[in-house]
A protein has these predicted regions:
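Phosphate/oxyanion-binding loops and surfaces in catalytic or ligand/nucleic-acid-binding neighborhoods
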Residues: 63, 88-96, 110, 157-164, ...
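Hydrophobic alpha-helical connector segments
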Residues: 55, 59, 69-95, 150-154, ...
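Short secondary-structure transition hinges
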Residues: 90-130, 138
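Helix-turn-helix
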Residues: 9, 13, 17-51, 55
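Amphipathic, non-transmembrane alpha-helical scaffold segments
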Residues: 11, 53, 57, 61, ...
């Protein structure tokens, strides 16, 4: 097995164990045994349980980042891309947290640890928003004076919605499809885009 495949297998096994048993209850030995690798192999890749926890979070964020990149590359109008990016970000974060079971509590308890690992993802997402906003501005779709500022604000607004969205506290009882027109109206008006009635 190649170095990257071995490392990825260790990360996948660790994610499953963290989700099932929690971070505190999972040992490095548990990860080594469940992966069918020796402790020496595990310690070759990761110095500590925290290192492998960071790798699990990074792996989850890479999944999200890849999907956001796919949306940004679509040949659709920039105003549609922004709405799709917003909903994809929120739904993928919720799916990741829910899918990881016991890791969910750890995610919220160690938010500063998660923030440290998230920095690269956050920077990449802001750059993605800049690209889409520039595209919309150049096409005359958005009336934006400062693309960088609008990209920062958009990213941090979405990030601020993550926890309430995960807990289902936003648009309680409404479907995603029912909320999209209202969200689009708010976003488009902020971007200087007229909504056609």
């Amino acid at each position: 097995m190649s170095i990257s495949k071995t490392r990825q297998k260790l990360v996948d096994v660790a994610r499953q164990l963290f989700a099932k048993n929690g971070l505190e209850s999972t040992t490095m030995n548990d990860i080594a045994q469940a992966s069918g690798k020796g402790r020496r192999t595990l310690y070759t890749y990761f110095k500590s349980k925290e290192d492998i926890y960071y790798a699990v979070i990074e792996s989850e964020l890479e999944r999200l980042s890849d999907q956001l990149d796919e949306v940004a590359a679509k040949r659709i109008p920039p105003q549609e891309k922004i709405i799709e990016l917003i909903y994809l970000h929120l739904s993928m974060i919720r799916e990741t947290v829910v899918r990881n079971g016991n890791l969910r509590a750890e995610f919220f308890r160690n938010i500063w640890m998660v923030e440290k690992v998230r920095k690269n993802f956050d920077d990449a997402e802001i750059e993605l928003f800049r690209k889409v906003f520039r595209e919309g501005k150049e096409d005359g779709e958005f009336d934006i004076d400062n693309v960088d500022l609008v990209a920062d604000i958009t990213h941090y607004c979405i990030k601020g919605l993550e926890v309430p969205y995960i807990y289902g506290r936003i648009a309680h009882g409404m479907t995603e499809e029912a909320t999209k027109p209202q969200v689009a109206k708010i976003v488009y008006s902020a971007l200087g885009k007229r909504v056609k009635s």
